[in-house]
Regions:
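C-terminal, non-catalytic extensions of nucleic-acid polymerases
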Residues: 1-257, 402-414, 511-634
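Glycine- and small hydrophobic-enriched segments that form the cores of compact globular domains
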Residues: 227-237, 241-243, 248-252, 256-258, ...
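Conserved pre-motif C helix in the palm subdomain of viral-like polymerases
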Residues: 240, 244-287, 361-391
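Short helix/loop capping segments that flank catalytic or ligand/cofactor-binding pockets
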Residues: 258-260, 270-272, 323-326, 481-482, ...
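Active-site-proximal segment of RNA-dependent polymerases
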Residues: 261, 265-315, 385, 401-412
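Conserved PLP-enzyme active-site core in the AAT-like
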Residues: 293-300, 446, 453, 479
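Conserved polymerase palm-domain catalytic core
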Residues: 308-432, 437-453, 460-477, 491-498, ...
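Extended, charge-rich low-complexity interaction segments
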Residues: 486-513
C-alpha cells in the first residue's frame, strides 16, 4: 500500500492548497495510523470518519458521539484530524453547522476519507462468514414481516398498486399472453455451470416453466417433428427437484463482500425475456417512466441536486433492498394479472444453496435474478406512495400554484390518493434500486411505511434536513446545490503491464481525478502509468448517439477537452493515429452447431452482426492483455 499512501498524500496536499488549509499534521497522522493499524485505517476507519461527518451535517451540529476514534477539541467536539477543513464547515465555537459552510472544504474531507472506501480487496474469512449469516438473518426477518403484515396494510397495498400500475401491468399481461416474451441468455454464470454457447444446448427445464413457457416454444426453433428428439431428451424437473440458486460472494470492499445468487440457466433464460418486456413497457407508461425506469441514473441525480439546493426533496437509502422484497408482496402486486403473475412466479427460484445448505426462500429473489431490479422498484415505489398518502393526511399535498410554483393543499380529512395526486408528484418521487427520492415533508412517513413492510432504511445514508441540505443518490452527492461527489480508487495500483484490470482501473482513476479538477493528483498518476505503457492524450468529446461524453480513441489515454496532436497519419484511411495501449481479450473456445446454433441466430437482437467466430468462441474472457500499437485518435 506504499504507492496508494503516496497518492493520498499528494491528494490531501492538493485539497489543502485549494481550501487554504495546512495539512502537514494530517499527513503525519495518516502515516502514523497506517503504520499502526495497517490498510484498515484507509478502508474502514476513514470511511467511518466520513459517516460521522455526514451525520453531523444531517443533525446540523457536532455531537459527542461523533469521531470517537480521534482526538477532539474539548469545547466544540471537532476532531483535530482534518480540523482545518472542518472549521470551514462547522462553527469552531459551538460546533453548529455554518450558514456559509464551504462546499470545497466538505468535498476535501469526504474525498480524503472515501478515496479507498470501495477498493476491491478480499475480506477476512470472518467477515465473509458474517455476510452469509446476515443473508440467513435477513431471510428470517422477511418471514417475520410477512407474519406481521396486517389485512388493512394488504388492502392499502393492493389499492395503491392498482392506482399506480394498472395500465402498465395490463399491457405487460397482454404481451405475455400473446407469447411476446423472447427469451435470452445472460452473460454471467449459472447454477448448473453452463457458460457461453453451452447455454443454447440446455437440457434442463422445470414443470413450472413448462406450464407457462413450454420448451417447444422457447428452447427449439419450432414445434416441427424434427426437433422432438431434442425435447424428449430434456429433463423436466418437478418443483421439489429444481436446482437452487447458488449464493456466492464477490469482492466489494474490505468491510464486507457482495453476495449474489447465481440462477439456473432455464430460469435466467426466461427472466431475461420478462425483463425486456418490463423495461419496454416502463418506457411507454406515464407513471413508470418517471417513477421507476432504470434507463438512467441522471433523473435521480438531478432530483438530489434540487433537494440539496432548496431542501424540498429528501434522499433515502435502503439496506439489503433486494433481499427484503417479500415474495408475498410480489404475489399481491401481480395477483390480478393472471399471465404476468404466472410468468413471474414460474421464473422465480424457490430455494437457495447457502454454503452447502439448501433453504426455502421467503424473499422474492436476490441480486442475480434478472427480474429483481424492476420488481424491487415496483414494490418499494408502491410502499413509498402508501407512506405519502398517510403523510398527506397530516401535511397535505403539493399542488400547482398560479405562478407554476408548488403550494400546499391542506386536506380537511384523510382521503385516498388519486391519479391526479400522483401526476402532481411526478418529478418529486423516484425509485432507482435502493435509492429513493421523496418530498422532504413525507420522508418520515415513507420511512415508517417502508420499515413496516420489512425494508431497512439506512439512516446513515438518508438525508432530509432542510438546513444542512446534503443529499446523496445514485453515487452523486450534493451540498447546497454544489456537486461534492468524490473519486474512489477501486483497485490496487498496477505494478507491471501484466496487471491488466489494475491498469485499466488506474487509467480510469486518473481521468476521474482530472475531471474533478485534481490536476496535481492526475499528474502523479500520469508519471506512474507512463512507466508501464505509452499514455497519450485523447479527446473527451460529446457523442450524439450516446448522449454523453466519451473518449474518441480506443487506447488507454488521458482525457483532454482540447484537440489532441496526432503521432502520425494513416496513409490509406487518412486519419490521425496515436501510439498507445489497448486491452485485447478472447472469449474461451466454446463450439456450437446444430439446433443450438440456429436458436442463437433466432434469439439475436438488433442489427449489429454477430462476431464471425461466434460459433467457435463464446463467454466472458478468462484473461486479457495489453497490446501496444498505432490506433485512431478520433
Amino acid at each position: 500500500m506504499k504507492s496508494p499512501i503516496m497518492l493520498l498524500h499528494v491528494l490531501l496536499e492538493e485539497l489543502g492548497s485549494q481550501c487554504g488549509v495546512s495539512t502537514s499534521r494530517d499527513l503525519k497522522t495518516i502515516a502514523a495510523r497506517v503504520e499502526g493499524e495497517g490498510e484498515s485505517f484507509l478502508t474502514l476507519t476513514l470511511p467511518q470518519f466520513c459517516k460521522d461527518l455526514e451525520k453531523g451535517l444531517e443533525q446540523g451540529r457536532v455531537t459527542d458521539d461523533l469521531w470517537t476514534g480521534f482526538r477532539r477539541n474539548s469545547q466544540t467536539g471537532l476532531p483535530r484530524f482534518l480540523g482545518g477543513f472542518l472549521r470551514l464547515v462547522f462553527n469552531d465555537g459551538d460546533g453548529r453547522l455554518l450558514d456559509d459552510a464551504s462546499p470545497e472544504a466538505l468535498f476535501a474531507v469526504r474525498q480524503t476519507c472515501l478515496f479507498f472506501s470501495k477498493i476491491e480487496l478480499p475480506c477476512t474469512p470472518k467477515r465473509t462468514q458474517a455476510a452469509f449469516d446476515r443473508f440467513i438473518q435477513t431471510e428470517m426477518e422477511v418471514r417475520d414481516a410477512d407474519r406481521n403484515w396486517s389485512a388493512d396494510s394488504r388492502d392499502r397495498f393492493d389499492r395503491v398498486s392498482r392506482l399506480l400500475w394498472s395500465n402498465l401491468f395490463s399491457r405487460v399481461d397482454n404481451q405475455i399472453r400473446a407469447a411476446g416474451v423472447l427469451p435470452k441468455h445472460g452473460p454471467g454464470q449459472t447454477a448448473d455451470r453452463l457458460t457461453g454457447n453451452r447455454k443454447f444446448n440446455q437440457s434442463l427445464w422445470t414443470s413450472r416453466l413448462e406450464d407457462v413457457f413450454p420448451a417447444r416454444e422457447n428452447v427449439v426453433p419450432s414445434d416441427h417433428p424434427r426437433y422432438w428428439e431434442v425435447l424428449e431428451g430434456m429433463s423436466v424437473l418437478s418443483p421439489g427437484d429444481e436446482l437452487p440458486v447458488r449464493v456466492t460472494d464477490v469482492p466489494k470492499t474490505l468491510k464486507t463482500p457482495r453476495l449474489i445468487a447465481i440462477e439456473p440457466t432455464a430460469m435466467q433464460y426466461m427472466q431475461q425475456g420478462i425483463l425486456e418486456v418490463l423495461n419496454t413497457e416502463f418506457r411507454n407508461d406515464d407513471f413508470a417512466r418517471d417513477l421507476v425506469s432504470s434507463d438512467s441514473q441522471l433523473p435521480n441525480r438531478r432530483l438530489a441536486k434540487q433537494g440539496s439546493y432548496d431542501g424540498s426533496l429528501a434522499t433515502l437509502d435502503l439496506s439489503e433492498a433486494s433481499d427484503r422484497v417479500s415474495n408475498q408482496h410480489v404475489r399481491h402486486l401481480f395477483r390480478n394479472y393472471r399471465d404476468l403473475f404466472a410468468a413471474v412466479d414460474a421464473t422465480r427460484s424457490r430455494k437457495a444453496d447457502v454454503l452447502g445448505k439448501t433453504i426455502r426462500l421467503a424473499k422474492f429473489a436476490s441480486m442475480g435474478s434478472a427480474t429483481t431490479f424492476p420488481v424491487e422498484a415496483l414494490v418499494s415505489c408502491t410502499v413509498v406512495f402508501m407512506g405519502i398518502e398517510r403523510g398527506a393526511a397530516v401535511v397535505g399535498l403539493p399542488c400547482p400554484g398560479p405562478d407554476s410554483t408548488l403550494d400546499w393543499e391542506r386536506w380537511d380529512r384523510p382521503r385516498r390518493l388519486t391519479r391526479r395526486d400522483v401526476y402532481t408528484l411526478l418529478g418529486q418521487v423516484r425509485v432507482y434500486g435502493d435509492d429513493i427520492i421523496v418530498p422532504a415533508e413525507y420522508a418520515e412517513f415513507v420511512t415508517e411505511e417502508l420499515e413496516s413492510f420489512g425494508f431497512k432504511v439506512n439512516l446513515h445514508k438518508s438525508f432530509r434536513n432542510h438546513s444542512s441540505r446534503f443529499r446523496e443518490s445514485c453515487g452523486a452527492e450534493y451540498f447546497r446545490g454544489v456537486d461534492v461527489s468524490v473519486v474512489r480508487c477501486r483497485k490496487v495500483l498496477p505494478k507491471s503491464r501484466a496487471d491488466v484490470p489494475e491498469l485499466e482501473s488506474a487509467v480510469e482513476l486518473r481521468n476521474h481525478l482530472f475531471h474533478r479538477g485534481l490536476l496535481r493528483s492526475a499528474d502523479w498518476m500520469d508519471e506512474r502509468i507512463e512507466r508501464l505503457i505509452p499514455f497519450p492524450f485523447v479527446e473527451w468529446a460529446w457523442d450524439e448517439t450516446a448522449q454523453d461524453y466519451i473518449s474518441t480513441s480506443p487506447v488507454l489515454g488521458r482525457h483532454s477537452y482540447l484537440p489532441c496532436e496526432a503521432g502520425k497519419h494513416d496513409r490509406w484511411l487518412h486519419r490521425p493515429l496515436v501510439k498507445g495501449a489497448v486491452v485485447v481479450s478472447k472469449s474461451p473456445i466454446c463450439r456450437l452447431d446444430g439446433i443450438g446454433a440456429l436458436m442463437k441466430f433466432f434469439l439475436k437482437r438488433g442489427d449489429t452482426p454477430l462476431e464471425k467466430d461466434h460459433l467457435e468462441r463464446s463467454g466472458r474472457p478468462q484473461s486479457s492483455r495489453v497490446k501496444i500499437g498505432w490506433y485512431p485518435l478520433r
